[in-house]
Design a protein with these regions (language model features):
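Hydrophobic faces of well-ordered beta-strands that scaffold small-molecule active sites
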Residues: 307-309, 341-343, 365-367, 408, ...
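The substrate-binding groove and active-site-proximal loops of carbohydrate-active enzymes
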Residues: 104, 166-169, 251-252, 310-323, ...
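Acidic/aromatic-lined carbohydrate-recognition and catalytic surfaces
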Residues: 100-113, 120, 131, 135, ...
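Active-site neighborhood of glycoside hydrolase catalytic domains
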Residues: 360, 377-472
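Loop/turn elements at helix/coil->beta-strand transitions in domains of secreted/extracellular proteins
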Residues: 304, 334-341, 359-364, 399-405, ...
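Aromatic-lined substrate-binding rim segments of carbohydrate-active enzymes
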Residues: 340-386, 477-494
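Secreted/periplasmic carbohydrate-active enzymes, especially glycoside hydrolases
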Residues: 1-340, 589-590, 594, 619, ...
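Substrate-binding clefts and catalytic carboxylate motifs of secreted carbohydrate-active enzymes
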Residues: 5, 13-19, 25, 171-175, ...
Length: 818
């Protein structure tokens, strides 16, 4: 039977060239330990990042003692298991170096029986400076990599974004970042198990194939969500099959429940492991069609429109990431009607808790392997390392119901093919000559080695070579009509929001727009004098080149200029929400042709101006509230024609009269037909109805339905707006508004917003049309069931989800510039 001795907890740590020891905690990191004992201030405060970066130009030593008994040494196998060493680690036992680790993403295992003795033993791990290592490698073997990061990062199997990104600081921490322990066993050890599913009418056959080090008989059982237990007898066979009658199927969020079955495998020698699985089929359809080739998730035979965002590491200081914090973030995804999440390839493979929570919440996981924005040298050592890394991580993740596909890398095929020159030009990538071996190495890695490992390790998990891609082999990897797409002409290309409507991507896996965090968040990393977007500290917390200028450029196109720093932050969030709304609503209206909208990005790694919908401190931006509406299972939206779509620069000559019209569409991303009333009204700024209409509409399951275009030639360009809603059983399940000009030119009148609070209920009253009403507490954090919403004259009831409703104030677009 396998036994473990935990080696985590209290350690000590020092700079390699110093004899001054600091107390340390494992799992943890150098930065976390230096902050804990007061040696280093928080690197997220103001410009402290610079000092923290300099500290990582040194080597660090971790040390602890532990006791081993004669009984433990009597086992046939005594192993040191390190589930995460970050990254260049020399491991010594009792004064003798026994191993060197150089991959953060690997679980390292060494047999140490001969190096241990009964009594007290000393374990020491020395971490080489990742900065100095990468600098040396960058000189020795140059090659293309993201210029936002420290040069040479591509040579090290370490989370790339720790070296900096266009949303993250340069804080390449080091340390023992995951559990470390001694493991003893004798004749057999249960390493893992492969579970395969075969679905038939009313039955799912589950094949269980244990992976055993050594030899042992084994048995298994499956416990259903209702407690029913199905057993498999003890056997020495390689696999057994168990039939589950009347299976409870796992569905993505919004389409059904997420029942999980518990699989227990036991060895006769005593080892036992438990996994949770969901019964479902999950693949990707690439059927040819009239537009090219579709790309969509297919779950239990149903084609699903993916709605979600791209996930990056939650913190540069990895010790701060906890299962509770991750659950909070992912529950906020479900609250915003996500059914999917993409784990971006420039970070690290998340902990098991991440995938467990996605299983529970119904979030389909697009899992990148950890390669991003760089060309790699496939040396023999590198190949050996990535083979182990890929097998280990895929084997760890493969049983999860939420695992939708495994993708080879982020943006490497696109950059190597030069498929998107607009993106490259606007991103300020600094290209170096592409060496021929980089192309051949890429093909070997992502079209032969890695897909073969994934197929062998997780034969029922879909493989996709890169993001974006049309299927590999450098065949137009950002093609609008095939595969997945990264679209950045809105933002990097500074195109207007309406530009999204020109494209019908089969699956948009990246598109985004920046905003600043709210004032409460800015106050947590700045001094009062820093609170100007062009201050040194605010620019330090803005890592995308020229981004603040882009925000102001878009602001000039959209709103009146704000009168305060707080209003500027607010305006940036409103623009972000509007930009992404334009894209998502357009693609959902074209369901069938378009089958995925994954927003860049969900979260922040530190306090920063970025594309995130939830900031570093967990506060929802306006975008996340908007996502809750435009990702709603049943959603009404308008494709309006007006000045923004035809003549956004009002002084340019436009020979034809501007079309003023709108066309409504209702999307139904549920497994049942939905019948309701579509109601709309053309209104003046005070809410007075000029004309209106109502009609009954049935939208079939998993579809989108257009209504006829409504001509508004008689409407005032700047003095009329349209309100619309889809009403089911007298409840407006989705609603919105549209105008025919930029908000800055609309003839808003003071809505005279009033806010009343009654416990966890907030009643908002508006006396005129109010656009993007924002409610916030002056003192406390506040999460609401709706925010940044449009209002006709009247009242709206908003519920408090988290926080206190005391001292709540409201504002809207009317307040900007006044």
């Amino acid at each position: 039977m396998t036994e473990q001795v935990n080696l985590g907890g209290a350690w000590r740590m020092r700079e390699a060239d110093s004899q001054t020891w600091h107390s340390a905690h494992v799992p943890g990191s150098v930065y976390a330990d230096l902050m804990a004992d007061g040696t280093m201030p928080d690197p997220f405060w103001r410009e402290n990042e610079l000092d923290a970066f300099e500290r990582m130009k040194k080597d660090y030593v971790y040390q602890r003692t532990f006791t081993v008994t004669e009984a433990q040494l009597a086992h046939a196998h005594v192993e040191l298991v390190c589930e995460g060493l970050d990254t260049l680690a020399h491991v010594s036992l009792n004064g003798r170096e026994i191993a060197f680790a150089d991959n953060m993403h690997i679980t390292w295992v060494w047999d140490v029986k001969e190096q241990l003795h009964a009594g007290e033993n000393t374990l020491e791990i020395r971490f080489d400076s990742p900065i100095l290592y990468c600098a040396k490698k960058a000189e020795e073997a140059p090659g293309w990599e993201s210029s936002d990061a420290t040069p040479g990062f591509r040579h090290l199997r370490k989370a790339h974004c720790m070296f900096g990104w266009d949303w993250g600081p340069r804080l390449p921490d080091a340390g023992i970042w995951r559990p470390i322990f001694l493991r003893t066993w004798d004749t057999a050890r249960l390493e893992n198990a492969l579970m395969l599913q075969a679905h038939h009418d009313g039955v799912v056959d589950v094949t269980i194939r244990p992976e055993i080090a050594g030899e042992s008989a084994w048995s298994a059982e499956i416990t259903a969500p209702d407690g029913e237990v199905l057993t498999l007898p003890e056997t020495t066979a390689a696999e057994q099959v168990i039939a589950i009658q009347n299976p409870q199927l796992w569905w993505p969020n919004g389409l059904g429940k997420q029942p999980l079955y518990r699989v227990t495998v036991r060895l006769a020698t005593g080892d036992t492991r438990v996994w949770r699985i969901g019964l479902r089929t999950m693949t990707v359809s690439r059927e040819k069609d009239e537009w090219g080739e579709e790309f969509c998730h297919v779950v239990n035979g149903m084609k699903v429109f993916a709605m979600g965002a791209d996930y990056i590491p939650e913190d540069n200081i990895l010790a701060r990431v906890t299962p509770e914090r991750t659950r909070h973030l992912l529950e906020d995804c479900k609250a915003a009607n996500f059914n999917a999440i993409r784990v971006w390839g420039g970070g690290y493979y998340p902990d098991d808790a991440f995938y467990d929570i996605c299983d529970e919440l119904g979030l389909m996981v697009w899992q990148d392997l950890m390669y991003a924005c760089a060309f790699y040298d496939l040396t023999p050592d590198f190949e050996r390392s990535i083979r182990v890394e890929t097998h280990q991580n895929v084997a760890r993740l493969r049983h999860h119901a939420s695992l939708a596909l495994i993708c080879g890398n982020n943006e490497m095929e696109m950059f190597m093919a030069g498929a998107n020159s607009a993106l490259i030009n606007h991103r300020t990538w600094e290209f170096v000559p592409t060496y021929p071996h980089h192309i051949t190495d890429y093909v070997k890695m992502f079209e032969y080695i890695l897909p073969a490992i994934v197929k062998e390790t997780a034969p029922q998990t879909y493989w996709w070579p890169a993001s974006p891609s049309s299927g590999g082999n450098f065949d137009a990897p950002n093609d609008e009509n095939r595969g997945d797409n990264h679209y950045w002409d809105v933002w990097h290309g500074e195109k207007p929001f309406t530009e999204y409507r020109k494209f019908f991507f089969r699956y948009a896996s990246e598109f985004g727009f920046q905003s600043f965090p709210c004032l409460k968040s800015v106050e947590q990393f700045t001094l009062p004098d820093d609170r100007n977007i062009f201050s040194r500290v605010m620019e330090r917390h803005q890592r995308n080149q020229a981004a603040n200028g882009k925000i102001l450029s878009y602001l000039s196109q959209t709103f009146r200029y704000p009168n305060s720093f707080d209003d500027l932050l607010y305006a940036s969030q409103l623009m972000q929400a509007e930009a992404i709304r334009y894209g998502v609503e357009h693609w959902r209206r074209n369901r069938g042709r378009c089958m995925g909208a994954i927003i860049w990005q969900l979260n922040d790694i530190w306090p920063v101006a970025s594309w995130a919908s939830i900031d570093y401190y967990g506060r929802w931006k306006a975008l996340h509230y908007a996502a809750k509406r435009f990702f709603a299972p049943v959603m009404i939206s308008a494709e309006e024609e007006g000045e923004l779509s035809q003549n956004p620069k009002i002084n340019e000559y436009h020979p034809a009269p501007l079309e003023k019209s709108f066309r409504l569409n209702v999307c139904n991303e549920t497994l049942r037909d939905v019948t309701g009333e579509v109601v709309w009204a053309l209104r003046t700024p005070d809410g007075e109805i000029v004309r209106q209409n109502q009609q009954t509409l049935t939208i079939p399951a998993m579809s989108a339905k257009w209504l006829d275009k409504v001509d508004c030639a008689d409407a005032s360009l700047t003095g009329h707006y349209v309100s619309f809603a889809f009403v089911v059983d007298n409840v407006a399940v989705s609603e919105g508004t549209c105008i025919f000009c930029a908000p800055k030119h609309f003839e808003f009148i003071d809505p005279r917003l009033t806010v009343e609070t009654h416990g966890d209920t907030i009643i908002v009253t508006s006396h005129a049309y109010a656009k993007q009403v924002w409610l916030e507490s002056e003192d406390a954090d506040l999460l609401l069931d709706d925010n940044a919403f449009d209002m006709n004259p009247g009242t709206k009831v908003v519920r408090v989800v988290r926080g206190s409703a005391e001292k709540v104030r409201g504002r809207s677009v009317w307040d900007l510039g006044r």
